[in-house]
Amino acid sequence: MKRTFQPNQRKRKKDHGFRARMSTKNGRKVLKRRRVRGRAKLSA
């Protein structure tokens, strides 16, 4: 059986990167929540 995690930097950045988050209203909400929690890393 193929493993579910197939690492790919491009996919990672495109789906979970900072610019991807900033591009939608809900993505910005995610970043806001992470800032409130004090996360060291806001996005991938």
Swiss-Prot record:
| GO molecular-function term, one example from the UniProt record | structural constituent of ribosome
The record ties this protein, via PANTHER family, to: LARGE RIBOSOMAL SUBUNIT PROTEIN BL34M, MITOCHONDRIAL RIBOSOMAL PROTEIN 34 FAMILY MEMBER
Q: What is this protein called?
A: Large ribosomal subunit protein bL34
The record's NCBIfam families line, in alphabetical order, gives:
rpmH_bact (TIGR01030)
Keywords annotated in UniProt: Ribonucleoprotein, Ribosomal protein
**Family listed:** Belongs to the bacterial ribosomal protein bL34 family.
Write down the HAMAP family for this protein, in alphabetical order: Ribosomal_bL34 (MF_00391)
Q: Which residues does the annotated region (Disordered) include?
A: 1-44
Domain of life of the source: Bacteria
Residues making up the signal peptide according to the UniProt record: none
Q: Which InterPro entries match?
A: Ribosomal_bL34, Ribosomal_bL34_CS
Compositionally biased intervals (Basic residues): 1-16, 26-44
Q: Kindly indicate whether the keyword Ribonucleoprotein belongs to this entry.
A: yes
GO biological process annotations for this chain's record?
A: translation
Say which species the protein is native to. Answer: Fusobacterium nucleatum subsp. nucleatum (strain ATCC 25586 / DSM 15643 / BCRC 10681 / CIP 101130 / JCM 8532 / KCTC 2640 / LMG 13131 / VPI 4355)
- A GO CC term assigned to this protein in UniProt: ribosome
